[in-house]
Amino acid sequence: MPPYFMPFFTSYQRAFCLGAIAVAAALLASVACAHNDVVPYSNGTKIVTGGHSDLAGTTDELLSVFGYDFGEDPNDPWVIGDPGFNNSSAFTTSFPNAGALPAGALALSVFSGNYGSLHYWDGTGTSAAFSPVASGVEINLNRGSNNLRIGGATASGSLSIATILAAGRVHQHLQTSLGAGGSGGSFTTLGAADGIYAFGATLSSGGLSSDPIYFVFNAGMSEAIHDVGIDFYATQAVPEPSCFALVTLGVAVLAFRRKRH
């Protein structure tokens, strides 16, 4: 909040506002889940995203930050079958529009705004500190013969996820890899320094698009550090609302928050 705004409040209002900001930030940190498929659907005016975990059997109607881990397969540690996109009617019938998408090509595009390009944090310090990755390091998203490489200066580019038919459903996983050099889906050097890697994207289908969502990947760090990175994007990489909006948001999130899973 700009410093010139606070003097217009009484001391009580300032304390209330700061408290609201702290509460909202803490609550927003819970609106992000690791190891969830993205659940894209239409609310009639734009694409919205939730999350679903087959393993945990849980579904969230609203999620904007998703976490995944490299290294789950020791034989192929730098290639994973995430993120996934799944809006099955088995768990979305209570969503707006019954969880369906408009027919068309579901595409993922690099977010051109704040924290859209590939950022990195080495996991040290008292708080997360993300900055663009070193030149040459990229994350690659692959579907079939199509690839989307995202580096520290990438501000555009898109990848087709799936063709959405009249039923409005999708279940598709991308293959994600991390490395440097090469071209397309092949890196000269597969892998990169341990740490947390993240980028932002938007989704589009049938003429509608989403607000930015964020993908936060763990490479060789603890899940506690991964969670700190996820929470950073949940609280820092979104536009700062006014203090009164934060109060409303805090109450709303408190009413609907779910445990991280």
Regions found by a protein language model. Give the residues of each.
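Mature extracellular "passenger" or substrate-interacting domains of secreted, surface-exposed proteins
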Residues: 34-237
